[in-house]
Amino acid sequence: MFDIGFSELLLVFIIGLVVLGPQRLPVAVKTVAGWIRALRSLATTVQNELTQELKLQEFQDSLKKVEKASLTSLTPELKASMDELRQAAESMKRSYVANDPEKASDEAHTIHNPVVKDNETAHEGVTPAAAQTQASSPEQKPETTPEPVVKPAADAEPKTAAPSPSSSDKP
């Protein structure tokens, strides 16, 4: 894989022994071996997934070819019934779109006035006197119901705080 010969591997081992020492070298070798093992398993997993995806794609392509071939070799009666089913499905779609309650509620909440892009067009036909009349017209206040007034009870006496004992009360 890396095209490393025995002499190069021996040189790396000796350098590692000098740098890490005899106590830490086995731990470092185990760690590096674990990394290499993890990378190999990852590469194998990716390769297997790609192979499965390619097989699945080939299967789907062949299935589409078979479907096209079977549609062209259908009897005229089956073709006629398929056309009738398609027409029925299209008419159902059209009737659903026409009677869509969600669309009707959306239409009810839609503002149909076009957006005015030009400021002069928006104020066309409005004179200062008309604007003053609109501005000075009384506002309509919403009707309010009178709220009931709560009266305090006559027999209820206001509570007073009890006097706290002071230092002069003590003997």
Swiss-Prot record:
It is found in: Cell inner membrane. Residues 130-139 have a biased composition (Polar residues). GO terms for molecular function: protein transmembrane transporter activity. Keywords: Cell inner membrane, Cell membrane, Membrane, Protein transport, Translocation, Transmembrane, Transmembrane helix, Transport. Residues 100-123 have a biased composition (Basic and acidic residues). GO terms for biological process: protein transport by the Tat complex. It comes from the Bacteria. InterPro entries: TatB. The chain crosses the membrane at residues 1-21. Its main location: membrane. It is a single-pass membrane protein. Residues 89-171 are annotated as: Disordered. GO terms for cellular component: TAT protein transport complex. The Tat system comprises two distinct complexes: a TatABC complex, containing multiple copies of TatA, TatB and TatC subunits, and a separate TatA complex, containing only TatA subunits. Substrates initially bind to the TatABC complex, which probably triggers association of the separate TatA complex to form the active translocon. Part of the twin-arginine translocation (Tat) system that transports large folded proteins containing a characteristic twin-arginine motif in their signal peptide across membranes. Together with TatC, TatB is part of a receptor directly interacting with Tat signal peptides. TatB may form an oligomeric binding site that transiently accommodates folded Tat precursor proteins before their translocation. Belongs to the TatB family. NCBIfam families: tatB. This is Sec-independent protein translocase protein TatB. It comes from Escherichia coli O1:K1 / APEC. The lineage of its organism: Bacteria, Pseudomonadati, Pseudomonadota, Gammaproteobacteria, Enterobacterales.
